């Protein structure tokens, strides 16, 4: 059965600390989550300075954060003393972690997504962890005028090396104008499409830049590019209830989430010892980042 569009929601403009513009697609009042995905921010800005992209230390519980960059480089530090610049940053908060994300030098273009994946009930208090993956290790398919990168999960027999705690589908699609593609995706997975560039059509309905399209159930997905486009397909097996999404936390109860917020306010979360402020003056064009740490 072919998947069709159930609803289309346009991402809302917001700002990160430092005034970087982001387009927030999840969560929405009308759509709280898609599979395990409970949060999705899209950013696309030029001349991004260290002052503009500086998300200071903040806590997470019960989820995984996924930073996936189409272009540019983000610098991650956390309370496990990880410090890593890279294209795919996959952090497991589990029972609790503190982290920060920055740029250490001006980026000509910073374009990418940050998503959060809520952990299943029995994994929400696992030990925190962090993994970084270069984009080159992710499988890529060439299908009928489209290049598809398997960020997480499996597509047409191609399996991502990124380990997850539940079944996910997370695919980055770059497609040429006029190309049409048919995919077979796990029928039990909830799915949505978010358009990061250009526009596409599904069954004659257009999905434009900054649109999040929730899809109906099915095992086949067909789409056509009305112009050169880039979008992600995301989702997976549904998160079981009760699932509470509160500030930066995914928990079983509201009480647990509120306690996590109190713990943060009371300084109970571990610090990010390697976090520091970067400024444009810190770096010349050829500066070595390691000299700043």
Model-flagged regions — what are they?
Residues 1-293:
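Jelly-roll (double-stranded beta-helix
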